[in-house]
């Protein structure tokens, strides 16, 4: 993705201007349509009229996405001077253009100004809030297992979840509260009842849907046993699993695999096939297709070194020691990740390909040092999200949605 920044230091809040923008009826593009274009690899030019800091914190990305950032205040000033034509010409926009703002209001005004100047422009309906509601499901290759597996992708954050269906039973792994109804509906489409709602660990980047699915849909909550040591509230009547425990879903079996490092309690799940090489590994945030989980969210900087060492042991002795053909189904993807055409265009990959990509150093100390040097900024609201996922604090739906509106940042940055 390329991005051009044209904003000045004298910026005006797009939250404020969203409320005062003129009521216009510019042609719009739905967030789902935008996602489909990006997924197909079509060239997309975004004109993002949010402030620079908002764009730098969270933006729409993709392999062929180009973005120009100009504040709405600059457009308003150009209009007041009667110089919109000259201002737009200087932007040198590549058509068609999609205008973006927080809620799709001021960007509608900008799209209309562009169209008045002869630019092929559309407004992103509902803006970034609409983008955060895009949720896409694709089926993972699972012919050798006793289950059908859907991978859910939230492009706005890179969060991935999974629905495992076998016979008339289903389990959802790492569900998001914002989409709890979706898992139930999709299970019903397969003629199954959602029996289990499972978290691989205490999440720091999104509000878990496990509690809602347990309370409102009757699903059995399943969490790693170590979540109790992290302060899991007793009010949640959860089944706690340890290494080697099995969860039966119809004719399929999920086997727990303790995989600490990102957090102390993280427990991956393996869906077995006819042979060990036919399995799917739901790795949570322990292992991604191009990275692995950061070790500093549970115990901060003070405990990060020890957990990084634990992560090294988990990767080298447990996860990467599984059969090469194991399909890694991670808990997140990077914003710029490209779907894997060899795995039904999902964000999954064979374990041998993942191992080749990661190039884990032979020496633990070298690995630990590189991890600690490669930590990106922490998730923006993890201090609110973790207590909510432990059941220690309560967030209403609006607040729960808002605290997730940034990239997940749960992975270690790429290491050279």
Regions found by a protein language model. Give the residues of each.
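Accessory terminal helices/loops
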Residues: 2-27, 42, 112-117, 313-416
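Positively charged, proline/Ser/Thr-rich regional signature most characteristic
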Residues: 22-95
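Conserved beta-strand hairpin/beta-sheet module of binuclear metal-dependent hydrolase folds
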Residues: 51, 140-189, 269-283, 289-290
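Catalytic cysteine-centered active loop of the rhodanese-like fold, especially the PTP/DSP P-loop
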Residues: 70-72, 81-129
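Ser/Thr-glycine-rich phosphate-binding loops at phosphate-binding pockets of nucleotides
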Residues: 107, 198-201, 259, 263, ...
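Cysteine-dependent PTP/DSP-like catalytic domain, specifically the C-terminal lobe
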Residues: 123-141
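Active-site HxH/HxHxD metal-binding segment of metal-dependent hydrolases
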Residues: 133, 177-258, 279
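Metallo-beta-lactamase
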Residues: 168-170, 177-179, 192-195, 263-374, ...
